[in-house]
Amino acid sequence: MKDKFSAQREKMVQKQLAKRDIEDPKVLDAFRKVPREEFITESKQHQAYGDHPLPIGHGQTISQPYIVAMMTQALEPSSHDIVLEVGTGSGYQTAILAELTKKVFSLERIPELSEQAGRILSKLGYQNIVLKISDDDNDLTIHEQKEFDKIIVTAAASQIPPELTQQLKEGGTLVIPVGELMFQELLVVTKHNGELRKKSLGGCRFVPLK
């Protein structure tokens, strides 16, 4: 049975993602499955599939679908990956990752957002997600998992945090926006023989990480 947003969801996938440069069929399928409207307040649900960010409270936003898709595709997720997400936010990106990978650890510094995301993700039936609240803005570690195949950061850092690259497995990928408030660059960082290789996906605009 189709829900009332299913046509809007498919239109988003076709027009905002597939007609641009989102080509991975698994990524596109994940966006077909995850109901973005669930992660948005009821008064804004009619805008759920617009190509723009929306406020979620506490000075934070849910990113526009294309940005979430671009970052997800750049991560090159696979079904055996253990992933770290820094910045749970609404939980929408978390759900997309959970559709594509083995397990997602997601770290959030705002308790109310983490709790809200937890309720939504539980309602949707996800069982491969572990949500964590960071007690310290400078602590970006998950103590029960030392290394990750993939790391994604959904807020902008002034520079690439070394504690994240230290947690990245050899051959792993980190996707992170880096820069100051007025200019940021979305970077894809890979680790090869202990060395970091960086590729830019272009300019972007995210709320600050700290």
From Swiss-Prot:
Record's subcellular location: Cytoplasm
Active site: S63
Catalytic activity: [protein]-L-isoaspartate + S-adenosyl-L-methionine = [protein]-L-isoaspartate alpha-methyl ester + S-adenosyl-L-homocysteine
CDD domains xrefs: AdoMet_MTases
Entry keyword set: Cytoplasm, Methyltransferase, S-adenosyl-L-methionine, Transferase
BP GO annotations: methylation; protein modification process; protein repair
EC number(s) from the headed UniProt entry: 2.1.1.77
Name of protein: Protein-L-isoaspartate O-methyltransferase
Main location group: cytoplasm
Annotated GO CC locations: cytoplasm
Organism per entry: Natranaerobius thermophilus (strain ATCC BAA-1301 / DSM 18059 / JW/NM-WN-LF)
This protein's record includes keyword Transcription regulation: no
Single GO molecular function: protein-L-isoaspartate (D-aspartate) O-methyltransferase activity
